[in-house]
Amino acid sequence: MASATLAFSCSSLCATLKLPQNLNPLLLNVPPLSKPFSGVVSPPSLSRLSLLPVAAKRRRFQEIPEELKAEFEEFQRPPNQKPQLSDVLPDDFQAPEPGTPEYNDIINQFLPKKGPPPPREEIFAVVVIGSRQYIVIPGRWIYTQRLKGATVNDKIVLNKVLLVGTKASTYIGTPIVTNAAVHAVVEEQLLDDKVIVFKYKKKKNYRRNIGHRQPITRIKITGITGYEDYPASTLEAEVEAKEEAEAEAEAEAVPV
């Protein structure tokens, strides 16, 4: 009898509140059957009713005023279309045909072309910084180990140059290129990405998960100088030396 009264009360409550059919009945504050039932169901709390779906209100945009509609229609164009000369020039202006010098002059006037980029020196070098070797090119930047005592915008000179390469020749050091220097500027002092060091001992309940960030320095290469007086080794000279060595080896192999 108590269960029938509870079902009737719940159905009448849902009909009164007009709750959706897919609503979870656990959201309602229904007293458990283990307690004495008085026949009256307590109304749901406001926090439970706040979970009910609410119809979203549509926002209406304000219409364009009548005095601005004419100007808006003049500049209205299909989507994804580039601006035309007619949007800038007056209506009575007669635009020249595309491809003519007059048309190009107008295009250059409104859309000036960028000048050619400055010529870049085609040269690279291999330099040693902190027991590591780096390939450096003027105009580019690299990350190295922390340079102690260096601050931002400091100019530095790297003297341990192992090799210098140009478009015409190559300068190979023995072990370094004499008087060669790489000029750079310190841009930033920062920390590298975090490295996780995990330590584990079997059957000892010992685990350590410690992180570490290595200090590094970012430098920008500005130039490579001082290699001109060093003897260069070209590809043709290497080929000739190789041919001479092969000829001498063949001459020694021929019996007298």
From Swiss-Prot:
This is Large ribosomal subunit protein bL21c. The keyword Ribosomal protein applies. NCBIfam families: L21. Keywords: Chloroplast, Plastid, Ribonucleoprotein, Ribosomal protein, RNA-binding, rRNA-binding, Transit peptide. Belongs to the bacterial ribosomal protein bL21 family. HAMAP family: Ribosomal_bL21. GO terms for cellular component: chloroplast; ribonucleoprotein complex; ribosome. GO terms for biological process: translation. GO terms for molecular function: rRNA binding; structural constituent of ribosome. Its main location: plastid. InterPro entries: bL21-like, bL21-like_sf, Ribosomal_bL21, Ribosomal_bL21_CS. It comes from Spinacia oleracea. Component of the chloroplast large ribosomal subunit (LSU). Mature 70S chloroplast ribosomes of higher plants consist of a small (30S) and a large (50S) subunit. The 30S small subunit contains 1 molecule of ribosomal RNA (16S rRNA) and 24 different proteins. The 50S large subunit contains 3 rRNA molecules (23S, 5S and 4.5S rRNA) and 33 different proteins. Signal peptide: none annotated. Residues 1-55 form a transit peptide. Component of the chloroplast ribosome (chloro-ribosome), a dedicated translation machinery responsible for the synthesis of chloroplast genome-encoded proteins, including proteins of the transcription and translation machinery and components of the photosynthetic apparatus. The keyword Ribonucleoprotein applies. Pfam families: Ribosomal_L21p. It comes from the Eukaryota. It is found in: Plastid, Chloroplast.
